[in-house]
A protein has these predicted regions:
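C-terminal hydrophobic helical "lid"/dimerization subdomain
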Residues: 1, 228, 275-330
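Glycine-rich beta-strand-centered segment in the early N-terminal region that forms part
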Residues: 19-35, 49-91, 124-127
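Rossmann-fold dehydrogenase core element
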Residues: 239, 251-292, 310
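Residue-level marker of beta-strand positions
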Residues: 64-66, 83-84, 112, 157, ...
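Glycine-rich cofactor phosphate-binding loops and adjacent beta1-alpha1 units
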Residues: 150-153, 188, 192-263, 322-326, ...
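Mid-domain Rossmann-like dinucleotide-binding core that forms the NAD(H)/NADP(H) cofactor-binding site
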Residues: 84-85, 125-207
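Cysteine-cluster motifs in flexible loop/terminal segments that predominantly coordinate metals
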Residues: 79, 88-118, 125
Length: 330
């Protein structure tokens, strides 16, 4: 089968032919119908320090996968050949993150992926493979950050910093929870989609949130220009949820953090149950992830687009589509 392989930091991705996977006990093979592209893939490619996560090398990248089960291993009872499934990026409990596809074992940038049954979530009717794939991280991560880590409730005021794929989902999720939402992105072109997603207003600088004093600020960027200013801009007693890995080190105004009783919380991924809830929201039409298809053979070039900040919403690819054919609907 065809797969996009990563051989080490600083080395280009390569399209290779690799053996088809075979499921052992408790595992299944999923024919991948859609796989999302993520900034975390860029972090892996750059060799960024990911804390306790150790990236296997070489490895097939891709941690946002969805498709159809084509074979099952011994002992698999709750799923069967033909089931439509998303492969959850389970990070709660956080110890499970080391088993993430595209990190600890081969991921979704391939025609088929080996997945443990404990990571599978059925895709409801009304949810496309593309939506199901990007939801495993892009939507579920935003859902956990806003709802669980941020404890956003009806009537809250929320700032969302970074209005890319995750940020747009964060805006919509906060709005669905009954919050008044303000968006922040240095690129004015990102403001229109955020306003359409439910933001009341958008700014270019995190410090502009100071006038609103949000109860919660969710930082999907994680850069020196966002995290420190978020701590200063949130209301006294408020919380800042840090999701982005834009910088290896953040400068935090300690006096503002301590004297104003601000909580700074790191947030990684989501639970399998949260992914189920996200799928139901998409099935009901309450959430509609913005997606754009890129041909599988052009995935390395698409990653370059992502690195340059040229993507609004979320990119995905169809590894099983004919490599000679361009984009099409899923």
């Amino acid at each position: 089968m065809k797969a996009i392989r990563f051989a080490g930091a600083g080395r280009p991705l390569s399209l290779e032919t690799v053996p088809d996977p075979a499921p052992g006990p408790g595992w299944v093979v999923v024919d991948i119908e859609a796989a999302g592209l993520c900034h975390s893939d860029l972090h892996i490619m750059s060799g960024m320090d990911l804390g306790d996560l150790t990236v296997k090398s070489p490895v097939t990248l891709g941690h946002e996968g969805a498709g159809v089960i084509s074979s099952v291993g011994e002992g698999v009872e709750d799923f069967a050949v033909g089931d439509r499934v998303g492969i959850a990026l389970v990070t709660h409990p956080v110890e499970e993150a080391r088993f993430a596809p595209g990190v600890g074992h081969d991921g979704a940038f391939a025609e088929r992926e080996l997945a443990h049954v404990s990571t599978l979530v059925r895709i409801p009717d009304g949810v496309t493979f593309a939506e199901a794939a990007v939801a495993t991280d892009s939507v579920a991560t935003a859902y956990h950050a806003v709802r669980a880590a941020g404890s956003v409730r009806q009537g809250a005021t929320v700032g969302v910093v970074g209005l890319g794929g995750l940020g747009l989902n964060g805006v919509r999720i906060a709005q669905l929870l009954g919050a008044t939402v303000y968006g922040v992105d240095i690129n004015p072109a990102a403001h229109g989609p955020a306003l359409e997603a439910g933001a009341t207003a958008c700014f270019q600088d995190t410090r502009e949130l100071m006038a609103e004093r949000p109860d919660v600020i969710v930082d999907f960027v994680g850069a020196p220009t966002t995290t420190g200013p978020a701590v200063e801009s949130v209301r006294p007693g408020g919380r800042v949820v840090l999701v982005g890995l834009g910088g290896a080190v953040a400068s935090i105004p300690v006096a503002s953090l301590v004297m104003r009783n601000v909580q700074l919380i790191g947030s990684l991924g989501a639970s399998k149950e949260e992914l189920r809830e996200v799928y139901e929201l998409i099935a009901r039409g309450a959430l509609k992830p913005a997606v754009e298809e890129v041909p599988f053979a052009e995935l390395p070039a698409a990653m370059d687009r992502l690195a340059r900040g040229e993507v609004r919403g979320r990119l995905y690819t169809r590894p099983r589509a004919d490599l000679r054919v361009g984009a099409g609907a899923v």
